[in-house]
Amino acid sequence: MTKARFESIGAYIPNKRVSTEELTANMNIPPQFDLEAITGIKTRSWKEDKDDSYTMAIDAANSCLENSKYEAADLDIIISCSIARFVGDCSYYEPPMSLFLKHKLGAHKAIFFDVSNACAGMFSGLYILESMIKAGVVKNGLVVSGEYISTIAETAVLEAKDIYDPQFGSLTVGDAGAAVILDKAVDDNDVIDCFNLISTPEYSDLAIGKPSNDSNRYAMYASNSKMHTEERLKIWPNFQIDMLAKEGKDFKSEQFDYIIHHQVGSKFVERLLKVGKEAFSAEQPESLNVLEKYGNTSSTSHFIVLYEYLKANKLKDKSKILMVPAASGFVTGFLSMSINNLAVK
């Protein structure tokens, strides 16, 4: 059976950093909480004047191509997956961001479309592309996101009142671009082993991005206390248990080396590790994180983690990695993959 693999990965991380101390010092209402202690985020990556969704996606895509055997002209498809779609000061929905990227990169034969699924956007794009490769519809493709999302943090600085404010979670975000090229796996050392997503729309109203209720700014309103209950967090391990059981497998037998959770904050990751340990009755793999430096970069967060660890040569050979999305919607699931030759130059 045909399987897909991560052929290459790339990223663009702005050089600018905004510290948690700096961010909260600018709040209209002096905070009665220690955001850094709550989230574990010391700084977050922040767009520079030259950056927008488009430029960050282009830079991430070029980074990915530099690490790839493919050139842009070889790409069969481009899927753009960002939440924000800024080109300059304008937010574009038509024409799609993927068309801008196709022309700029020179991917002249590539079909193209956009997918938006909150912080699970890149997972959704990869899920579609993996299915297309397995079905023989395309041979390869680029999934990319330029996530300029700090606009909601700027709104929260002006409007959030306390830890219970629905805009509180917006204070964790940072900006970054990420890109992945998938193609057909040639062996079991580099392969997507198992990939499934689940959406639970009954919880879709717990996090909504929209214009602010109090200004003309972009904002996100999230009920974190309801989103992060144990009942919600257990959706992931229970789903993975069911999917693995259908293949006659369990978590222990998968022998994961590393796990990457959504970079919302350190306490959130710790809770998911605890829930996973209890649900699977198994110790959790080593947890990879870069949230202390970059914050929650939304749809790019898992892939920024993977990119940074590859760049620093911190992963052992023939690693097996589990990625667990967590997004508004409520979307979760798991991507299990083996990597050996995936590298960042």
Regions found by a protein language model. Give the residues of each.
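Glycine/charged-rich beta-loop-alpha catalytic/anionic-binding loops adjacent to active sites
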Residues: 40-43, 82, 103-115, 159-165, ...
